[in-house]
Amino acid sequence: MSAQDKLIKPSHLITMDDIIREGNPTLRAVAKEVSLPLCDEDILLGEKMMQFLKHSQDPVMAEKLGLRAGVGLAAPQIDVSKRIIAVLVPNLPDKEGNPPKEAYSWQEVLYNPKIVSHSVQDAALSDGEGCLSVDRVVEGYVVRHARVTVDYYDKEGQQHRIKLKGYNAIVVQHEIDHINGVLFYDRINAKNPFETKEELLILD
């Protein structure tokens, strides 16, 4: 039984046990494009990936299943070398602590995503980045594009083009890196992890 066959079984919930860690060669491989129209197995895998993200952000389910919270997941992280990513970016409460009107600022499964253009300006998260496949803290600015335009297909096989900036742009670049065999710390300056160039936008 392949990793994908196991993951898409109706009774299976993706947990941290399914997520491979750095050192596994799948994380360093360039993933294959999925065939269109999508097969049922690839649609199911995308749904399972999104289900994992929702569980990971739900305090009750996360504790029950022992999950680390995540806003994105790429198929190679569950040992399936295909160009499929899921993103689930929650909206935060306002300054008064009131819950947001919409739970998520971005919720999507992207098939064969590709960055088709990007800004000259770079950006990095002030607190750095983490990864479900990396069980350690790696400090430093992960330098990425401040704005990106991404083409992708949804589960219906419809093509989309989306323009992203800020945190959502960082998230999609992190996940697209995964399908290209790149890990976030590859983008940290090894000699000077917190190097700031004049044009670097630091996002809080």
Curated annotation (Swiss-Prot):
Active-site residues, Swiss-Prot/TrEMBL: 175
Reaction equation(s) it catalyzes: N-terminal N-formyl-L-methionyl-[peptide] + H2O = N-terminal L-methionyl-[peptide] + formate
UniProt-listed Enzyme Commission number(s): 3.5.1.88
Binding note for cofactor: Binds 1 Fe(2+) ion.
Keywords: Hydrolase, Iron, Metal-binding, Protein biosynthesis
Positions annotated to bind Fe cation: 131, 174, 178
Required cofactor names: Fe(2+)
Xref: CDD domains: Pep_deformylase
Gene Ontology MF terms in the entry: metal ion binding; peptide deformylase activity
Metal-binding is among the record's keywords: yes
Gene3D superfamilies: Peptide deformylase
Disulfide topology: none
GO BP annotation list: co-translational protein modification; translation
Function: Removes the formyl group from the N-terminal Met of newly synthesized proteins. Requires at least a dipeptide for an efficient rate of reaction. N-terminal L-methionine is a prerequisite for activity but the enzyme has broad specificity at other positions.
Family: Belongs to the polypeptide deformylase family.
Matches recorded under NCBIfam families: pept_deformyl
Protein name (database record): Peptide deformylase
Species of provenance: Streptococcus pyogenes serotype M1
